[in-house]
């Protein structure tokens, strides 16, 4: 018989009760409100990014497992967990596809709006990990010239496919996808510093859908660019109003918030906890998942970029997120910022979308390369 256990779970973790209830008693609480008292009888703690997991929270509790359903790690004191034999699992890569789709969707939208062709542009990816690799794959499918900057990978792989940061900053479009670190040889805090941003030219496009603080925001404000796409902010939920006003697209750290990314994070932590307690996973929770979106039908224009834009507009529209935060004045209202993130509208990732095959085999192959199902 399975011993009685208690799990305290951030109530923003999707499908928490459906996934975890067979493992024990599930207590769902707002992540920012979880405190030591709530954990007195808890065996496991499952969080997103709003709970600071450290000695102040866990000391004098019986928590033996901490799971984070998001990829960021700066809310978890990992040395403390290790020193106290508390197992930690983070759902690394769970939202990588969602973030890559956010970046590519915005680039396609910009190309249509500003009347340029993506296949004629160069894209530098700063940080080629879970997200960067998927951005690379999608950008190459669209015919872009892709340049890669990732010093740790360059050293480890001894590969000449990577370039240094100064050369990467010469690209038409620059997107950052590193973790946020403040120490070590490859620290990324203010990686794009005042000196680096002085190299940026007015025709370039700059994107941050990684972590706030990788780009020095005060320097960014004084950097003339063609366009800025910003999802991550240095002091969020305090959004820099000057930078916000310079952004073509400004969103409240939701690039990784596609429903499928959240589900993946929940499931990854669930399976890790099952392994920790040596319990067989139960897949019956899947019956609660929503059905796939309706099929997408398309009338081709003959221009692949325009046709891809028409498909993507039926999947997710970042301009609607931008309009929502501007209409609600989220830039100066912390509660609205958090509310929008917690009540984020559902959208699905491209692999969940079915597109009816078109008469153009080349375009069908492009859709397949981007991850769509063809029917």
From Swiss-Prot:
Question: Can you name a GO cellular component term?
Answer: cytoplasm
User: What role is this protein assigned?
Assistant: Catalyzes the oxidation of erythronate-4-phosphate to 3-hydroxy-2-oxo-4-phosphonooxybutanoate.
Question: Which reactions fall under this protein's catalytic activity?
Answer: 4-phospho-D-erythronate + NAD(+) = (R)-3-hydroxy-2-oxo-4-phosphooxybutanoate + NADH + H(+)
**Quaternary state and interactors:** Homodimer.
Q: Which PANTHER family match?
A: D-ISOMER SPECIFIC 2-HYDROXYACID DEHYDROGENASE CATALYTIC DOMAIN-CONTAINING PROTEIN-RELATED, D-ISOMER SPECIFIC 2-HYDROXYACID DEHYDROGENASE FAMILY PROTEIN (AFU_ORTHOLOGUE AFUA_1G13630)
Predominant localisation class: cytoplasm
One GO BP on record is: pyridoxine biosynthetic process
Question: Into which family does the record put it?
Answer: Belongs to the D-isomer specific 2-hydroxyacid dehydrogenase family. PdxB subfamily.
List the active-site residues: 211, 236, 253
**Which residues are listed for NAD(+) binding in this entry?**
150, 178, 231, 256
The record's GO molecular-function terms, alphabetically, read: 4-phosphoerythronate dehydrogenase activity; NAD binding; protein dimerization activity
Q: What is this protein called in UniProt?
A: Erythronate-4-phosphate dehydrogenase
Where does it live in the cell? Answer: Cytoplasm
Question: What CDD domains does the entry give?
Answer: ErythrP_dh (cd12158)
Q: In which pathway does it act?
A: Cofactor biosynthesis; pyridoxine 5'-phosphate biosynthesis; pyridoxine 5'-phosphate from D-erythrose 4-phosphate: step 2/5
Q: Which domain of life is it from?
A: Bacteria
Keyword Protein biosynthesis recorded: no
Question: Quick check: keyword Amino-acid biosynthesis in the entry?
Answer: no
Keywords, alphabetical = Cytoplasm, NAD, Oxidoreductase, Pyridoxine biosynthesis
Q: What is its EC number?
A: 1.1.1.290
Q: Name one Pfam family in it.
A: 2-Hacid_dh
Amino acids binding substrate: 49
